[in-house]
Amino acid sequence: MSSDITGTAAWQKLRDHHAQIQSVHLRELFEKDPARGQELTVSAGDLFIDYSKHRVDRDTIGLLLELARSVDLEARRDAMFAGEHINTSEDRAVLHTALRLPADASLVVDGQDVVADVHEVLDRMGDFTDRVRSGEWRGATGERIKTVVNIGIGGSDLGPVMVYRALRHYADAGISVRFISNVDPADLVRSLSGLDPATTLFIVASKTFSTLETLTNATAARRWLLGGLGLGNEAVAKHFVAVSTHADRVAEFGIDTANMFGFWDWVGGRYSVDSAIGLSVMAAIGKERFAEFLAGFHAVDEHFRTAPLEENAPVLLGLIGLWYSNFFGAESRAVLPYSNDLVRFPAYLQQLTMESNGKSVRADGSPVPASTGEIFWGEPGTNGQHAFYQLLHQGTRLVPSDFIGFGEPTDDLPTADGTGSMHDLLMSNFFAQTKVLAFGKTAEEIAAEGTPEDLVPHKVMPGNRPSTTILAPKLTPSVIGQLIALYEHQVFVEGVVWGIDSFDQWGVELGKTQAVELQPVLTAAEEPAAQSDSSTDSLVRWYRRQRGRA
């Protein structure tokens, strides 16, 4: 059994340090160290990161790095990059970083050159999407493809939809992309509304080609297609391709296995958007820009792999996240992108961090002695300012925040007076929010403005609310890759300190099997047997009455 991290000397030092610093205000930290705004920053690729508005000082950072070294973080990082089987519960390598290695790199894992394998699939993806984008690929009636519909769930959906929306300005071939994930039929009906079957191409993304939700939706989409075209099953091969590794099931569905794009067991779903799972993104933006996307990942991978811990952005941010979770008792982190193009980024990060680190046992099966897994949530600015920032500013819960902004916009328009820039207005809000969260406004300052005495307590802004500022020149394919990698490696850092396996997800399995067992109970003509608990039994019977099956 591995040692209890909370009983180590490094952890105890942090506990003692927290007792000293927890009552220190950010105003005081900046007064004592006026240079911290310039010095508590780090760069990774095109990302400029300011962590000076965190409730840390240089001693805090030193102690957090001591904790990281005490769990051999650097060795664990190197083991991941080398392809060792660090996913111990499934005895697998963890090699999402290999998906973005350049073609001239070499990485042999379990006797196989994985870089060659990755680029063979990328080349096939590029050839296929070139044909779709150019109009060479035609549907069963001879018309060119205008809409690509990605059918997947979890990592097969969250990544592609997030990246497609982020990079909408780079979709330059007249092809739009839609996404279907939920087994709720409303998702499919609305996603297919207004589409012409003759000009629609479906990508069915399921590694085993057996995922219940995905295959249910794919079958319904096939029925829609054939009904709309008035053709037989031979039309399927012109309108469906697969991202899968199960050729027999793909062929049985009617898809030509020549148009099946695979990936590997060493790629977890939530780390797979830069694999063949990103086929819909490549169809939209083209293979050259998809290569830029991969290069962005790789730039931050190399930073994480080689930068000293003191200058390593994912290490510092991961440790700071752990600092709030385990010493301040924070339970969530707000992700606040000041770009409407990143509207799905918080949801993407929810899966990345919560499925990875939402564990209660360590890799050796023993209980985790500390809280694990940050709850990520958020909305783009300035929408969030008019929704939940009230709690961030004046609530009783501590919610560290990540602000993400850009120097250049993807779109810009004049302000109301016709002269200014709406992007400048957006970013003035961005900088104002991080400032007010950190420094607030005291009762004395409010009273000095002539505020009625009875209103002063209501207007006090306590400040001391921590945030990270992440800036990049512009939201490009490379930059979105860098942002994703920045968070991927933070998740890894936290998982190593907690001693958990960040790359399995056993917690999602039981619900799947229970759903399969309950479906016939919901639909059977005869009265079902009593369920194992009275709540489920009562709920099932209510549902059956609503469906006319009582």
Curated annotation (Swiss-Prot):
Keywords: Cytoplasm, Gluconeogenesis, Glycolysis, Isomerase. This is Glucose-6-phosphate isomerase. Catalyzes the reversible isomerization of glucose-6-phosphate to fructose-6-phosphate. It comes from Rhodococcus opacus (strain B4). GO terms for cellular component: cytosol. It is found in: Cytoplasm. Signal peptide: none annotated. It catalyses: alpha-D-glucose 6-phosphate = beta-D-fructose 6-phosphate. GO terms for molecular function: carbohydrate derivative binding; glucose-6-phosphate isomerase activity; monosaccharide binding. SUPFAM superfamilies: SIS domain. Belongs to the GPI family. Its EC number is 5.3.1.9. Pathway: Carbohydrate biosynthesis; gluconeogenesis; Carbohydrate degradation; glycolysis; D-glyceraldehyde 3-phosphate and glycerone phosphate from D-glucose: step 2/4. It comes from the Bacteria.
